[in-house]
Structures are given as structure tokens and as C-alpha cells.
Amino acid sequence: KFEYLLYRKDRIKKFKCKIKKIKINKNMGWCDDTSSNFYNKLIKFPFKKSAEKLYLKKRIYDLILIINFNRKPVIKNKGSAIFLHLENIKHSPTKGCIAIQKKPFLKILPLITKKTYLFIH
């Protein structure tokens, strides 16, 4: 299932979405440190443990759907920051996420609800 959407308001001006939306700001990140109680959770910088920045110069995180993978409960070393986000210009593979182009992302976004499942085969 999808939990919520993170988005860059300065870059993504118009879209429709039925699930919770959170604007990405410069101090937002996602904890990937298994020794932290915040592992696989949204955090704010400054942060003492390892975390991935969400406010990037590149556009891959302009739209991020948070996938309910290893979230409730969170299990250490099972994986963190597993998102559906925008693909990069080179269409290169992700490190565990799912990446799609902006146009199809915006097309499916209004169809997603809290009950929508994502199946990966």
C-alpha cells in the first residue's frame, strides 16, 4: 500500500492526489541507519545518524510515494527508503526503489488511495 506523498512544491505546481501530501523542504530526510530508532522513517536535519536527503538538485525526488514496505513494524536491516519516485534522466536503475517518468506518475497519482496495493513480481 501507499502511505503518503512527498513532493517539491517549488517544482510540482499542479497535480491531483487523494492521499496525504507533505511538502518536501530543505531539512527533510529519510533515516537509513539501522542503529537509529528512526530507521526507515522521515526525519529532519540536522540529524546525528545516517539519512538520505530528500531535497535534491536532481529531480528524482520531486514526487515520492511512500510505500508501506518495512514500515509497521520496522525491522532493522530489512530495507529502508523503498519509494516510488521519478526516474533520472539516464533511466538508470535504482537502489531498491521503483522509478517512473513524470508524466505516467502524474497520470496514476489521482487513482491512488489508502487502499491501493502495489504488487512487484
List each model region and its residues.
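Cell wall/extracellular polymer interaction/catalysis modules
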Residues: 1-95, 102-121
